[in-house]
Amino acid sequence: MQLYPGIIGIKVNKIGEDEIEINSEDEIENLSLKDGIAYVHNSAPLYLKGVNTKYVLPKPLKLLRLGIPTSLENAEQVQVNYLTFFDKDYVLVGFNLTDDFKEPFAILEFDEGYTKVVLKDEFSEVKPKKEKIKKAKRKKKGAKRASKKQKAKSKSARKSRRV
């Protein structure tokens, strides 16, 4: 769901829960999904499979407020406008930023005292610059040629070279 232009929250409706035993991270990767997502909540790094999200919250958290900067003229006193979601049941497991997000940052405040400051630069994908490979000019090597026999010189030419 769109929380603000460019900020998309990932909300999950719980339909069912299965308890499975997982011994390694490879087993998490190989989980088969029909319709839904796999949310592994006992692992140290939270694992969410089936949803394409750039930022995963540590656990499902209810969004309380979303802060968007309104004035950035004074770096010491940034004015922030808050959108409140107290009356809505927005329990999120993650969120994404799209290219429509024009602000430099956003502040997401959740229940249980969890706050996340999202920087636009943090989510913008850096396009790798292709380095041009400079090819060194190579000299073409020709095939080795048999050395030519020296011309037979006259006797007088050979004598003049001797010292």
Curated annotation (Swiss-Prot):
Region (Disordered): 128-163
Biased composition (Basic residues): 129-163
The protein, known as: Uncharacterized protein STK_12200
Species in which this protein is naturally found: Sulfurisphaera tokodaii (strain DSM 16993 / JCM 10545 / NBRC 100140 / 7)
